[in-house]
Amino acid sequence: MEQCRKSFPEGFLWGGATAANQVEGAWDADGKGPSLADAMVAGTHQLPRRITLEIDESRNYYPSHSGTDFYHHYKEDIALFAEMGFKVYRMSINWPRIFPKGTETEPNEAGLQFYDKVFAELKKYGIEPLVTLYHNEMPLNMVTAMGGWVDRRSIDCYLRFAEVLFRRYKDVVKYWIPFNEINDLTTAVGNWNHGGILNHGTEDFSHQVDDPDKRYAALHNQFVASAKAVLLGRQINPEFRFGTMICHITVYPLTCRPEDVLLTQQEDQLRNCMSGDVQCKGVYPYYAKRYFERNHIHFDVEPGDEELLRRGTVDFYSFSYYMTNCVTAQKDAAQVSGNIMGGAKNPYLKATEWNWQID
């Protein structure tokens, strides 16, 4: 019997990850514009998070405004990463720190200089950067002026942002993720934080008004933007490597009833598999097309989009894991919360004080 390894193999990239909107703070420093994350008020166990397009720090607490103050303490933080033995650090670049409104033609040099210093510090400790281009940091102006990712113009704005980074860091960064947890838009909670969609003035983050046509239009535009970014990046540096990034919530049928088993299969396909299939294989899978048809979901696919998806596939598959869910057709089944989405309560698992089940 082969013994379990007691150490990582040579070249294994062990490390950690952050999102710019969660750690940087300095939300309006050195020319940075507000992002959609900057408009989200903190919640409590009793009160859900809210979205406020008018940012008022005198009345509300916005977590992204301070984060962990990585903007001013990146040197100490990266030194700690090195002390932990990090070989890779996954980070995102805050879009409105580079293009404050998202629609400018010239980038904010002060923002770029900050990331210059971060990459130099990582190099000092031999830590490989893995850069996420979009981690729920769309410039707030693009949300209010365009309606977020539903508008096709967002693709060009994103590509302008991506090109600046690809050219500036073509000899610094090898690994790129165009979109964090791109499959978030297969759920209603993804409307705001991933799509920049504010349906009918939705303010309650946990109970957003959902328009599936808009949501899947935004997701399609992100698929196209990702494919275009991959193709552009490979022109700039053929050694670049791009990956999909999926929020994978493992699902189990609550019972052996055929209805529960079938519903679990469908949930797994749509939430966990579809987005990875599009980005890795370059086509919408048959089950996605069937889902759109059965649920009367319509969005525009422009001439050339399908060819772009075929050509702009990614090189690697990455995912995040939070917890599992159970799925059932029973309407009265006990429910639990979770990150991004909840589900039916698994009677065999314990739960945190936030009602996330532990497994």
Where are these regions (language model features)?
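Active-site region of glycoside hydrolase catalytic domains
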Residues: 2-58, 82, 101-103, 109-359
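A common structural microfeature
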Residues: 11-13, 71, 88
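Acidic/polar N-terminal loop/beta-strand segments that form early-domain functional surfaces
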Residues: 17-19, 92-96
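Active-site mouth loops of central-metabolism enzymes
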Residues: 59-73, 150-153
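Internal amphipathic alpha-helical repeat/solenoid segments
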Residues: 66-79, 100-101, 111
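Catalytic domains of carbohydrate-active enzymes, especially glycoside hydrolases
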Residues: 73-94, 128, 312-316
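A short acidic, glycine/proline-enriched capping/turn motif at secondary-structure boundaries
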Residues: 87, 96-98, 136-138
